């Protein structure tokens, strides 16, 4: 095995230099050289996002009674989205960490709802062959048939 945890920590500058080296072969997403997966506006906006991220990087949204700010963010995002979609006050939602988690939770919710409907049995999803792999992963995890 080539990689082991070092006996002692390394200076931050050394670690950051390694990170820069590691990313040197990555595609140039900052200048329109990547058609998806990364979305870049400009340096000022990237700096703003970095500062906003670092303000909450250590927070954990698992328990909203501890990090009340994260719960507030989630509630405001859900309320704003519901308003955009003309939702009623009874609308509920969840904020996810990204695309795959969103697909997983959507299929789990669909599967759970299907279990409450008499006569449904094993639910199914109709998907195009070009569907994102996350939908197939969700179908396996939650026993939903793909057609």
Label for each model-derived stretch:
Residues 1-90:
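N-terminal entrance/gating region of PLP-dependent enzymes' catalytic architecture
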Residues 44-48, 61-147:
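PLP-dependent aspartate aminotransferase-fold enzymes
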